[in-house]
Amino acid sequence: MMSKMGAMFVLLLLFTLASSQQEGDVQARKTRPKSDFYRALPRSGSTCTCFTSTNCQGSCECLSPPGCYCSNNGIRQPGCSCTCPGTG
């Protein structure tokens, strides 16, 4: 009787460890593509200089095209950059 209970405990332990390992693998696969996606996005303002105040209201000096303006980079990258028509 004790050997049956011991065998059941070992099987339960092995099953628990195997399922938790699979869950960790799924989590690792979920996070990686998101960072690759953000890294692949084109960064606007690479040929521009943004002369700004603290709230990103200023002028841009760009090689091309005309009509660029200063804007916030966003929550993940604080600061300002030039946003130009057709560059996103």
From Swiss-Prot:
Modified residues (Threonine amide): T87
Modification after translation, per record: Contains 5 disulfide bonds. The predominant peptide contains 2 hydroxyprolines, while 2 minor peptides contains 1 and 3 hydroxyprolines.
Propeptide boundaries: 21-43
Record bears the keyword Disulfide bond: yes
An annotated Gene Ontology molecular function: toxin activity
Main subcellular localisation: secreted
Tissue specificity remark: Expressed by the venom duct.
The entry's keywords: Acetylcholine receptor inhibiting toxin, Amidation, Disulfide bond, Hydroxylation, Ion channel impairing toxin, Neurotoxin, Postsynaptic neurotoxin, Secreted, Signal, Toxin
Subcellular location: Secreted
Domain of life: Eukaryota
Signal sequence interval, chain numbering: 1-20
A single cellular component GO annotation: host cell postsynaptic membrane
Function: Alpha-conotoxins act on postsynaptic membranes, they bind to the nicotinic acetylcholine receptors (nAChR) and thus inhibit them. This toxin shows high activity on alpha-9-alpha-10 (CHRNA9-CHRNA10) (IC(50)=9.79 nM). It also shows weak activity on alpha-3-beta-2 (CHRNA3-CHRNB2) (IC(50)~1 uM), alpha-6/alpha-3-beta-2-beta-3 (CHRNA6/CHRNA3-CHRNB2-CHRNB3) (IC(50)~1 uM). The toxin binds to the same or overlapping binding sites than conotoxin RgIA (AC P0C1D0).
UniProt comment concerning the protein's domains: The cysteine framework is VIII (C-C-C-C-C-C-C-C-C-C).
Similarity remark: Belongs to the conotoxin S superfamily.
Miscellaneous comment: Negative results: shows no or weak activities on 5-hydroxytryptamine receptor 3A (HTR3A), and alpha-1-beta-1-delta-epsilon (CHRNA1-CHRNB1-CHRND-CHRNE), alpha-3 beta-4 (CHRNA3-CHRNB4), alpha-4 beta-2 (CHRNA3-CHRNB2), and alpha-7/CHRNA7 nAChR.
Name assigned to this protein: Alpha-conotoxin GVIIIB
